[in-house]
Amino acid sequence: MPKHCFLGLLIMLLTTATETQPAHVSLKPQKVQFQSRNFHNILHWQPGNSLTSNGSVYFVQYKTYGQGQWKDKNDCWGTTALFCDLTKETLDPYEPYYGRVMMAWAGSYSEWTRTPRFTPWWETKLDPPVVTITRVNASLRVRLRPPELPHRNQTGKNTSMENYYNLVYRVSIINNSLEKEQKAYEGTQRAVEIQGLTPHCSYCVVAEMYQPMFDRRSPRSKERCVQIP
């Protein structure tokens, strides 16, 4: 057989093998993983390799590490979305969990795709603190509040991020007239007073949270600005 004919036959065979890939393989959801922010734990995924997203539905299950039986997530059983909120099912931040997703399309069902082991305490990302400022003469009183969590205590109030992590707050102040930024505070207190500001100048305050254990920091907060009379 001529070389070019053999090459053409090989390509045809490979193409046919790909096109006739079993549905349970070609429909299998991809990139199934948890994305967690402030302990709000959302399972995300992408459609299978066959790219049959139109008309496809998904089924979601979850379990705690060490448990034998998977549990259905009713709100995401037959969903057309590419995500599922599993916050209520993964409330213990120290517990490791798994999630998995199956896809159905045109009467065919994929295999399950499982996440890596997910522990919220290790993997959640923190939003910046909420910053409020009050001017008192030539000083600024800065109050910092960590982001709210989905967990509630026995009185029904949201628990603080400080219940789970040692947090360090970093506050910077920007002199808009000089376009100069400098650190004003770094520590664990959530109430800070910045003194000695120059009259007739505009200042902005920005803050972030730092987790020493993970050497990890949050994004910076929105700037809060004020004019010193």
UniProtKB/Swiss-Prot annotation:
Coiled-coil blocks: none
Name of the protein: Interleukin-22 receptor subunit alpha-2
Residues bearing glycans: 54
GO cellular component: cytosol; extracellular region; plasma membrane
Signal peptide positions (record): 1-19
The organism's place on the tree of life at top rank: Eukaryota
Family, per entry: Belongs to the type II cytokine receptor family.
GO biological process: cytokine-mediated signaling pathway; negative regulation of inflammatory response
Annotated positions for site Critical for IL22-binding: 65, 117
InterPro entries: FN3_dom, FN3_sf, Ig-like_fold, Interferon/interleukin_rcp_dom, Type-II_Cytokine-TF_Rcpt
Entry's localization field: Secreted
Domain Fibronectin type-III: 28-127, 128-229
Molecular function terms from GO: cytokine receptor activity; interleukin-22 binding; interleukin-22 receptor activity
Function: Receptor for IL22. Binds to IL22, prevents interaction with the functional IL-22R complex and blocks the activity of IL22 (in vitro). May play an important role as an IL22 antagonist in the regulation of inflammatory responses.
